[in-house]
């Protein structure tokens, strides 16, 4: 008998067991496909390159009418509570049960809505050219791919059907680990990314932004080992919650860059899948005409598992004619690559045949009709849904599951055939970021009102009270202890990653995104992004912070306790006098207790006087100073010694790398925050206990990093060192948890100062009035 019994998957009835009206609804749900049948006279031809980018954008009235009528219906949703509306539409979604059933029944890896959508596309169109099967090799490129569900879906499709080909893939997305990226623009789920980083290309600047010409050039070099690219997918979009009626216009530049990248990299006869939304505007019409001229077949497809009430569609393009056929035009289009497309239109009106416009209008009307019907029906059911309608919806959802499984013939895949058979990373940003990205607790109108509030109004209305109150009772360090383990630091496999200097730190895999975002807003709105500590933020005599400051005596008491623990474990010989290196301090104050340690001072006044700013610990000057102090300290330490090291914050990969090195050469690391009453200065210290020696190759590697830092700073280079320890190493569970605790304590301390000061000023003004 098997020791491990699998949870049985619920047996499903045949679709034919449902009533004809239920079946008719489900057939229609799975039939949202429109094909561009080309005219026999072959009049859909690309214009002469001299005609592109010569005219202004001029919209077509017929398409604008469709856009306006759709937005009129969308506007009816503006006063709906987002959490209530999403709960409602989740229930009315006829395909709502498919994802969970697929996940359980076929053991699908990273089974998300995107996984199911792409599986529908794979099973509905001949995406993989016959050449790939004939040659036994398939190459695919996936743009804007996070979290990687298209790749996981394709892997399941190939492995479960046992297609006779070796598959290689390369993917791109906005780098979830790059500090200058905005987390609102990204999908912060890195379950696949963290374990397959070698196959992800983030461009020469490491941001992952495809909307630069340097990215396109770099990508071509990155995939140069692929003889031909058979399939390109592009699943990009922006968060358009702030302006849903203009989604098409907001993503037009991204779609342009995705299309140019695909046409530049795709091999002859290859396939291209592009996510689009409504296609009413001139820029979208031009791209659709371009694709119809460059590929033999173009289909617009809305998968059943794509929510019926949104504008999302997938443009499926088959049998690419090749770069040679469009080379002169493609070269000119490449010059227009970037975030800000030229104000001129790709094609003037007169080069687009009426036959194409007619066919495109039919396509837009086709999907417009389905979307309007869905939104209107959802509004009707939101206001009143009886038991009969609930029962019908449940039947529809059950039938959709049956139909999906029968139509696409999904097969079970063992975990041994997954892309990530066993995660090498104990904890990734996914588990930390879960639930943070979208907080649907306000209506669209309420969110617009909140955006309109000034920073001072938000403070006055108490929007940030929870941060200050939570910080007031927060006692970090007492439970945040990072235990070191003997590990082989394979620094010969590491490499130093350079990139463009960070303008500010917006994102960090080592901190709660909401806290960092709020702190940045506080710095920017309250302090203008910089501090003048001699004036505005020098505390007045009567100003005091309600949070407790940890004294030097308390810190040394904790240090001695941890040292005694090591002696009890016989890690340190009791007879040896332990040295305590105090970094960055010129003297000791107010210590009345007996310290059974040999205390030595390593002065570095600058290290403790750095102020919090929008750059945080991303300032290369601070990073060089911190590393320099660390290298000097390590030369002084012997086995069993301890060190107290002040730290500004650890939001960046660079600083996280240094904490990892400390983690590797000390038995325990903990922290105390706040340790200073100075506003917005360095307010945390690391207690590093039980030095275990740092291998010489690692020390030499750190020296080379330090030398590069100095060279870049002295030459006023536009580059800086972004990373020197692999992300796979930095995302291990215990280290990641420790960094989250440390950064939360530091950020909340700074927020407390700013918000409390703002409150004082507001109260003072109110008293004067």
UniProtKB/Swiss-Prot annotation:
Q: Which UniProt keywords apply?
A: Cytoplasm, Methyltransferase, mRNA capping, mRNA processing, Nucleus, S-adenosyl-L-methionine, Transferase
* Keyword flag Cytoplasm: yes
Major subcellular location class: nucleus
InterPro entries, sorted: Adrift-typ_MeTrfase (IPR025807), mRNA_Cap_2O-Ribose_MeTrfase (IPR050851), RNA_MeTrfase_FtsJ_dom (IPR002877), SAM-dependent_MTases_sf (IPR029063)
Entry's EC annotation:
2.1.1.296
Query: What is the protein name stated in its UniProt record?
Result: Cap-specific mRNA (nucleoside-2'-O-)-methyltransferase 2
Give all residue intervals belonging to the Adrift-type SAM-dependent 2'-O-MTase domain. 109-322
Could you tell me where this protein is found in the cell?
Nucleus; Cytoplasm
Q: Which GO terms describe its biological process?
A: 7-methylguanosine mRNA capping; methylation
Q: What class of enzyme is it?
A: transferase
Q: Which domain of life is it from?
A: Eukaryota
Q: Give the residues annotated as active site.
A: 117, 235, 275
Where is S-adenosyl-L-methionine bound in this sequence?
148, 167, 235
Please provide, alphabetically and separated by semicolons, the GO molecular function terms listed in this UniProt record. mRNA (nucleoside-2'-O-)-methyltransferase activity
| Role, per record | S-adenosyl-L-methionine-dependent methyltransferase that mediates mRNA cap2 2'-O-ribose methylation to the 5'-cap structure of mRNAs. Methylates the ribose of the second nucleotide of a m(7)GpppG-capped mRNA and small nuclear RNA (snRNA) (cap0) to produce m(7)GpppRmpNm (cap2). Recognizes a guanosine cap on RNA independently of its N(7) methylation status. Display cap2 methylation on both cap0 and cap1. Displays a preference for cap1 RNAs.
Q: Which GO terms describe its cellular component?
A: cytoplasm; nucleus
Catalytic activity line of the entry = a 5'-end (N(7)-methyl 5'-triphosphoguanosine)-(2'-O-methyl-ribonucleoside)-(ribonucleotide) in mRNA + S-adenosyl-L-methionine = a 5'-end (N(7)-methyl 5'-triphosphoguanosine)-(2'-O-methyl-ribonucleoside)-(2'-O-methyl-ribonucleotide) in mRNA + S-adenosyl-L-homocysteine + H(+)
């Amino acid at each position: 008998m098997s020791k491990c019994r699998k949870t049985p998957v619920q047996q499903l009835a045949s679709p034919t067991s449902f009533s004809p009206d239920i079946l008719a609804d489900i057939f229609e749900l799975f039939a949202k496909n429109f094909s561009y049948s080309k005219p026999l006279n072959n009049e859909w031809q690309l214009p002469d390159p001299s005609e592109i980018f010569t005219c202004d954008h001029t919209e077509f009235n017929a398409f604008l009418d469709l856009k306006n009528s759709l937005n009129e219906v969308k506007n009816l949703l503006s006063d709906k509570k987002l959490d209530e509306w999403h709960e409602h539409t989740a229930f009315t979604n006829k395909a709502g049960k498919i994802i969970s059933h697929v996940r359980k029944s076929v053991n699908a890896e990273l089974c998300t809505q995107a996984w199911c959508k792409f599986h529908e596309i794979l099973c509905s169109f001949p995406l993989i050219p016959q050449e790939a099967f004939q040659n036994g090799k398939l190459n695919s490129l996936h743009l804007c791919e996070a979290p990687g569900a298209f790749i996981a879906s394709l892997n399941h499709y190939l492995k479960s059907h046992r297609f006779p080909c070796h598959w290689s893939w390369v993917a791109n997305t906005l780098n979830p680990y790059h500090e200058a990226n905005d987390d609102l623009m990204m999908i912060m789920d890195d379950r696949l990314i963290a374990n397959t980083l070698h196959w992800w290309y983030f461009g020469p600047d490491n941001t992952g932004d495809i909307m630069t010409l340097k990215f396109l050039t770099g990508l071509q070099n990155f995939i140069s080992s692929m003889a031909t690219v058979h399939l390109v997918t592009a699943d990009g979009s922006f968060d358009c919650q702030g302006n849903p009626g203009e989604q098409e216009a907001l993503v037009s530049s991204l779609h342009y860059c995705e299309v140019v990248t695909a046409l530049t990299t795709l091999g002859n006869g290859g396939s291209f899948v592009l996510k689009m939304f409504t296609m009413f505007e001139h820029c979208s019409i031009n791209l659709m005409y371009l694709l119809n001229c460059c590929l033999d077949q173009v289909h617009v497809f809305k998968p059943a598992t794509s929510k019926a009430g949104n504008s999302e569609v997938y443009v499926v393009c088959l049998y690419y004619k090749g770069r040679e056929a469009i080379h002169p035009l493609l070269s000119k289009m490449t010059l227009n690559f970037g975030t800000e497309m030229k104000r001129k239109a790709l094609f003037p009106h007169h080069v687009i045949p009426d036959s194409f416009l007619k066919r495109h209008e039919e396509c837009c009307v086709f999907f417009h009709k389905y979307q309007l019907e869905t939104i209107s029906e959802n509004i009707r059911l939101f206001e009143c849904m009886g038991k009969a309608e609930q029962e019908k919806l449940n039947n529809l959802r059950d039938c959709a599951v049956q139909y999906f499984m029968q139509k696409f013939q999904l097969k079970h895949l063992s975990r041994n055939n997954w892309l990530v058979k066993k995660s090498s990373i104990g904890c990734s940003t996914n588990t930390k970021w879960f639930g943070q990205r979208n907080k649907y607790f306000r209506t669209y109108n309420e969110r617009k009102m909140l955006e309109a509030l000034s920073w001072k109004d938000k403070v006055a209305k108490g929007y940030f009270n929870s941060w200050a109150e939570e910080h007031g009772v927060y006692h970090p360090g007492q439970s945040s202890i990072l235990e070191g383990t003997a590990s082989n630091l394979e620094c010969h496999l590491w490499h130093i990653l350079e990139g463009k200097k960070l303008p500010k730190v917006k994102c960090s895999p080592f901190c709660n995104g909401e806290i960092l975002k709020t702190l940045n807003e506080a710095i920017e709105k309250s302090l203008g992004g910089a501090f003048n500590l001699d004036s505005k933020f020098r505390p007045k005599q009567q100003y005091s912070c309600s949070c407790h400051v940890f004294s030097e005596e308390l810190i040394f008491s904790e240090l001695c306790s941890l040292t005694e623990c090591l002696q009890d474990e016989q890690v340190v010989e009791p007879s040896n006098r332990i040295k305590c290196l105090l970094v960055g301090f010129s003297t000791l104050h107010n210590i009345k207790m007996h310290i059974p340690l040999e205390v030595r001072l390593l002065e570095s006044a600058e290290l403790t006087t750095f102020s919090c700013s929008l750059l945080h610990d991303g300032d290369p000057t601070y990073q060089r100073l911190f590393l320099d102090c660390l290298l000097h300290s390590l030369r002084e330490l012997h086995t069993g010694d301890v060190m107290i090291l002040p730290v500004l914050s650890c939001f960046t990969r660079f600083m996280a790398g240094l904490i990892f090195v400390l983690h590797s050469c000390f038995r325990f690391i903990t922290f105390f925050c706040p340790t200073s009453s100075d506003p917005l200065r360095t307010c945390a210290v690391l207690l590093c206990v039980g030095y275990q020696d740092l291998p010489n190759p690692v020390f030499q590697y750190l020296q080379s990093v330090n030398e590069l830092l100095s060279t870049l700073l002295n030459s006023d280079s536009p580059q800086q060192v972004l990373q020197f320890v692999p992300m796979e190493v930095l995302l291990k569970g215990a280290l990641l948890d420790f960094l989250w605790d440390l950064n939360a304590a530091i950020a909340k301390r700074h927020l407390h100062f700013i918000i409390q000061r703002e409150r004082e000023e507001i109260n003072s003004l109110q008293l004067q009035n």
